[in-house]
């Protein structure tokens, strides 16, 4: 899995379905089609039918598209999606982390119209509506367009809490957002100390990313990216390139290049 094998013909364009529950998926080289909460029916990818309130179907998935131009659907749940690769699983050098132009969806790829709060919010019986304060966490994703490490925090000040750190907007919500952090790889952030020589070797391409429902964090990184926050309160950072960014419905934080929100 490196630059020398990227075009050697020893990899395939894969279709991968994680099914229900919490999955860890790697596309590796090739132009892959990955669905964190999907299933295969006679070799074809299908979507698990679920409402945003159905916790038995959507899992909190970890997905790396790896090399190639991949299409990734996180599905329901708080998913961590990297269009390229991390350094957490033996891909320790930049040469081992080639990346292409990816299309990444935090959900199932459903169209989220203007002033729409995302997926249908009903219970399993189809009767009651999930409150607005529950919608923020149910499908809150972190998505990196290119290479990077996504961490879920388990403690502060060197103390392991024994479980994932979470937070909630008020005391009446039962769904809690998992606290996460991102480490950008093979990427040179802008700023007063920007190093153009280092940026010349950055790895990545122009990606299209849709957060869909939930409070999403999206970082386009290298290339001219197209970013959609869609429903709820999202943070979107375009990174290097001529990016097109739409926050969508909700109170969003948007940076065209690099910085902190």
Model region roles, listed by residue range:
Residues 1-261:
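Acidic, glycine-rich low-complexity segments
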């Amino acid at each position: 899995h490196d630059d020398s094998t990227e075009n050697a013909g020893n990899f395939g364009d894969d279709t991968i379905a994680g099914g229900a529950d919490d999955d860890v998926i790697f596309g590796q080289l090739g132009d892959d089609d990955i669905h964190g909460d999907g299933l295969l029916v006679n070799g074809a990818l299908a979507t698990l039918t679920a409402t945003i309130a159905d916790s038995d179907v959507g899992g909190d998935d970890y997905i790396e598209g790896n090399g190639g131009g991949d299409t990734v659907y996180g599905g329901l749940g708080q998913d961590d999606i990297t269009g390229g690769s991390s350094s957490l699983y033996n891909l320790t050098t930049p040469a081992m982390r080639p990346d292409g132009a990816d299309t990444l969806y935090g959900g199932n790829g459903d169209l989220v119209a203007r002033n729409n709060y995302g997926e249908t919010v009903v219970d399993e019986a189809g009767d009651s509506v999930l409150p607005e304060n529950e919608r923020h966490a149910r499908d809150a994703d972190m998505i990196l367009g290119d290479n990077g490490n996504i961490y879920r925090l388990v403690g502060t000040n060197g103390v392991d809490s024994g479980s994932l750190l979470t937070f909630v907007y008020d005391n009446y919500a039962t769904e809690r957002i998992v606290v996460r952090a991102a480490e950008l790889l093979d990427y040179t952030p802008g700023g007063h100390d920007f190093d153009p020589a280092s940026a010349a070797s950055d790895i990545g391409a122009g990606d299209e990313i849709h957060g869909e429902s939930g409070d999403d964090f999206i970082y386009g990184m290298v290339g001219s990216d197209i970013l959609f926050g869609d429903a709820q309160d999202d943070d979107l950072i375009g990174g290097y390139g001529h990016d097109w960014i739409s926050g969508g419905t909700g109170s969003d934080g948007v940076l065209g290049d690099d910085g902190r929100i």
